[in-house]
Amino acid sequence: MSLEYRSALIFGWEAEELRRKMAEAESEKRYEYVDKIYEQLDKSNFILDINEDFLYVGKVISDCDIYDNADTIFIDEINFKEFAREAYEQIEPLKEFWKPTDPPQLIHFCYVR
């Protein structure tokens, strides 16, 4: 298995509480519950690293290999209201399991997939 190093920019949330629920359910062998969450995640934009150390949900602006030439994104050209609307749409399928308590944020991070 080859590892891929990626860089992502997302307008959304770190869904730490949801990630912990998934890890706890998996450790308790409640696989049906975990599968239900994954089914809903598949209806959303999300990024989960290979070790499942973090989970981000929202409007994915950019997600590329760190060796690729990513598109240039100018902060002053971002329509935050539109991205917020899209971010909230992305969490709609997950509301049975998790709801954010804060507004979405612009988050940049690197991860391994």
Residue locations for each model-derived region?
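Short, low-complexity polar/charged micro-motifs in intrinsically disordered terminal tails
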Residues: 108-110
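Acidic (Asp/Glu-rich) sequence patches and key acidic residues
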Residues: 1-103, 112-113
